[in-house]
Amino acid sequence: MGNFFTSLFSSSKAATPEEEKAKSDQKKFDILKYDGVRAQKMGQVAYAIKCFTEALNLQEDFETMTYLVAAYTVANKAEEALEVLNRMVELEPDHINTRLTRVSVLFMLDKDADVIADCQHVLELEDTNHLAWFLMGKAKRTTADPLGAIADLTKAIALKEDFTDAYLMRAQILLSMAQAAEALPDVEKAIELAPEEETSYLLRGRIHEAMGNLDAAFADYQDTLELNPFNDEAALLTGNLLIAQERLDEAIAFFDEVIDLKPEFAKAYAERGRARNLKGDKEGAFEDLKKSIELNPEGDEAQKLEGQHTNFNDMYKGGIF
């Protein structure tokens, strides 16, 4: 009797099959989404991707797409990340963070020309976004528009005066345009802002060398190596500078130390061989060249020899130099 009156006066109706399915799908979606979040936090990226993908098959959810993009990026699946980001931009074309995330993925895929349109869209929405100016400058640099890049980086710096990366990039571009004197103040500012950044000292060394300030360049290369003894470029620049100054014994001793530290550093053997050759030690030069090619058969030294010699034993020792 009680059940009769309950059903008689109740305003609730039994759920339709469609409503039951929607409720079930929502529950599955929530479980998959948050299982994916937990897996992602635990470093189980493959499982997280599976969870997010299955969740999105049930429901197109913007937040879940964001998680999936992050997981794809960690898994080095940039193409898959870009597909998701493209859909996110379709859903919310004015979402700034999504646009900037897509820019990062486009850089990963070497699609630098496509970056500019996204940056311009962000700047239409928010012209004070220093990161968008910086990224657009970076894209213009790699797409053969150095003047446009400098202009964009200058705007980024005006908006964020402590933007170390922008100073460094502008200095790199100016140096590439043979404007070393103009590049120097930018790299000096970068060092002031981040005194422990090895790449700044390396760049300043290259600028000093371009200006003919060889002692200052040498000091900067040494500072770079003090910050990171394994910086290959700094090691090669230091050795090359010693060779250029005809300080051959010092160059050989320096490369001895480099090779002791990194026995597999093929280019160090080649450069030590060059110094030995200039000193008249053809035998030592040949042995260094041989070791360099053994370590890196696809390197510059091997390419120079291609088609000239088929056997090291028949090769004129030191001839490559």
Which sequence ranges carry the predicted segments?
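Alpha-helical adaptor scaffolds
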Residues: 70, 104, 206-210, 222, ...
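Short coil turns that delineate tetratricopeptide repeat
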Residues: 26, 59-60, 93, 127, ...
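Terminal, low-structured helical/coil segments at or just beyond the last alpha-helical repeat
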Residues: 2-21, 286-321
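Canonical tetratricopeptide repeat
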Residues: 34, 67-68, 101, 135, ...
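Structural signature of tandem alpha-helical TPR/SEL1-like repeats
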Residues: 43-50, 75-87, 109-121, 142-155, ...
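Helix-start (N-cap) detector for alpha-helical repeat units in TPR-like alpha-solenoids
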Residues: 29, 62-64, 96-97, 130-131, ...
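Position-specific recognition of the canonical hydrophobic site in helix A of tetratricopeptide repeat
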Residues: 40, 73, 100, 107, ...
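Alpha-helical segment of the N-proximal tetratricopeptide repeat
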Residues: 24-63, 67-74, 101-110, 138, ...
